[in-house]
C-alpha cells in the first residue's frame, strides 16, 4: 500500500585521501527513524543498526567513486491497509557523481501542483508515497521546458522544490520555509 519510508544519502569520494565520506549519515538515519514513527509503523528499524549496515555495505562494495545510498523501511506482508507491521528493510547504493546542475543551477517554475498538506498526509515524513506529489510537479516542469518545480502549499506559500529543499540567502543568512509550510523535516 505504499507504506514505506526512505532516505537519500550522498557519499563523496575523496581521491586525494582515497576515502569515501558519508554526508550526515547519523542525521539521515535519525530522520528515517522519525519517519517510521510519523507513519505509525508498529516496530521501528533504529538508526544505529541502519548506520552500521550502511557502513558495512560501503566497505563490502569498496566504492572508489561518489555514491547515492537509499535505505528503505517498509511494511511487509499482505495485511490490511491499516497494518502496522511487520517491517522489512533494505539499503541500495549506486555510483553517482555530482550532477552538473549543482554547479550550473536550474531553471525552475512554480508548479500548478500543490504540495500535499500535512493535514491530508504527513508531509514532514520522508515517505515514498509522498514523492508522487513532487513527481507530478517535476513531470509538468520538464514538459513545460524547465529543469525543476517549486511547489506552493495550500496557503500559496513556497513549500519546497521537486524532491529538494528551497532556500535563499539574504545578507548572509539562509532563509527557508517554516516547518508549518508542509515541508519535509
Predicted regions and their residues:
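Helix-start/capping segments and mature chain N-termini
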Residues: 1-56, 80-185
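Short, acidic/charged, Gly/Pro-enriched secondary-structure junctions
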Residues: 50-77, 94
Amino acid at each position: 500500500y505504499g507504506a514505506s519510508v526512505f532516505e537519500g544519502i550522498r557519499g563523496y569520494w575523496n581521491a586525494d585521501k582515497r576515502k569515501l565520506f558519508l554526508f550526515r549519515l547519523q542525521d539521515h538515519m535519525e530522520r528515517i527513524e522519525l519517519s517510521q514513527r510519523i507513519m505509525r509503523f508498529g516496530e521501528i528499524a533504529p538508526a544505529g543498526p541502519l548506520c552500521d549496515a550502511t557502513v558495512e555495505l560501503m566497505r563490502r562494495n569498496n566504492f572508489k567513486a561518489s555514491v547515492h545510498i537509499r535505505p528503505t523501511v517498509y511494511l511487509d506482508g499482505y495485511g490490511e491497509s491499516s497494518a502496522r507491521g511487520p517491517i522489512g528493510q533494505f539499503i541500495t547504493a549506486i555510483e553517482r557523481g555530482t550532477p552538473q546542475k549543482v554547479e550550473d543551477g536550474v531553471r525552475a517554475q512554480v508548479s500548478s501542483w500543490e504540495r500535499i498538506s500535512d493535514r491530508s498526509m504527513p508531509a514532514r515524513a520522508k515517505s515514498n508515497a509522498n514523492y508522487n506529489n513532487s513527481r507530478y510537479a517535476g513531470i509538468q516542469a520538464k514538459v513545460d521546458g524547465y529543469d525543476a518545480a517549486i511547489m506552493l502549499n495550500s496557503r500559496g506559500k513556497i513549500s519546497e522544490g521537486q524532491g529538494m529543499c528551497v532556500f535563499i540567502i539574504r545578507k548572509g543568512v539562509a532563509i527557508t520555509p517554516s516547518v508549518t509550510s508542509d515541508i519535509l523535516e
